[in-house]
Amino acid sequence: MWLQHLSLKTFRNYKETKIDFNPKLNVFLGRNAQGKTNMLEAIYFLALTRSHRTRTDKNLIHFDEEQLHLSGLVQKKTGSIPLEIELTQKGRVTKVNHLKQARLSDYVGHMNVVLFAPEDLQLIKGAPSIRRKFIDMELGQIKPIYLSDLTNYNHILKQRNTYLKSDQKIDETFLSVLDDQLVDYGCRVMNHRLDFIKKLESFGRKKHFELSNQIEELSISYQSSVNITDKQNLSESFKIALEKSRSRDLFKKNTGVGPHRDDISFYINGMDASFGSQGQHRSLVLSIKLAEIELMESITTESPILLLDDVMSELDNTRQLKLLETISQSIQTFITTTSLDHLQNLPENLSIFTIQDGKASVNGN
């Protein structure tokens, strides 16, 4: 798949911009704070209805406006798909083929993206919430039912936590009813995640072995607050975990076990990767990103769109060549950079957009 056209209206520092893209490689060139990353963020937001940089949607709206509008035309094997997002103070409206979508799971997945940014190193050494968000964003694109199950789980979780925080006397029977619902959707979420991690590890192991000159083996482990060793009895394991945690939950007034507490760990040759070197972290994250591309292709039969935010200057020549090798394989790619000197051995079929003060001009024109 590839993004043929993007229209931005009052998004970040872009007042109004319309831009046509190259189906292969697109480079956003400019000084810092001109809007290069904002352009990538717009593409990411159009795909996922979420920003990778802020949790507050109103930060995306141009400072002197009250709403924003993004639209794009995605080309896929099955044909063209127009996508639209309008964001106002009241919320967001999403459209596919000009038809309003009622649920997030009906919208996400029409345009798949893989983002690689310097902050992705936090995937290895950052907080568990960063890794959970990574799973949610990537898995949600290739399996829309996951977003539906996750939304339902979070809804029940919020209900349960609100009830635990209430001043009224706790009805343990009602709490058990909430627990049953939490177990139902929680097991669905965990099963989706376990399947995803297994496939990601399979693709990632091969990529990392190549990147490390056949000396490092990557493995990924899903760390759960629930006993996940027996998937057939996952529901029973979750119920037991909730029962054991009930006195703790009543005291702390929140839910202590479940997929909202889970994490993933990365290992290199059996050792915790978080203790590895900066170079190992870069290689590991690059391996994961390259694995994501292959995983998405294997499930959707479409290549995702690759977004590279100022990462080429962070990679040595070996890692750059490996990444460029992937780019050359019919994957639409967007790169931000302050200098073309950071980009070596680029393919010939590319478009360069100069970004200055929230305006984009192709090839400097």
UniProtKB/Swiss-Prot annotation:
Major site of localization recorded for this protein: cytoplasm
Q: Where does ATP bind?
A: G30, R31, N32, A33, Q34, G35, K36, T37
A GO CC term attached to the entry: cytoplasm
GO MF terms, alphabetically ordered: ATP binding; single-stranded DNA binding
What the entry lists under PROSITE patterns is as follows: RECF_1 (PS00617), RECF_2 (PS00618)
What job does the chain carry out?
Answer: The RecF protein is involved in DNA metabolism; it is required for DNA replication and normal SOS inducibility. RecF binds preferentially to single-stranded, linear DNA. It also seems to bind ATP.
What family, per the record?
Belongs to the RecF family.
NCBIfam families xrefs: recf
Name the UniProt record assigns to this protein? DNA replication and repair protein RecF
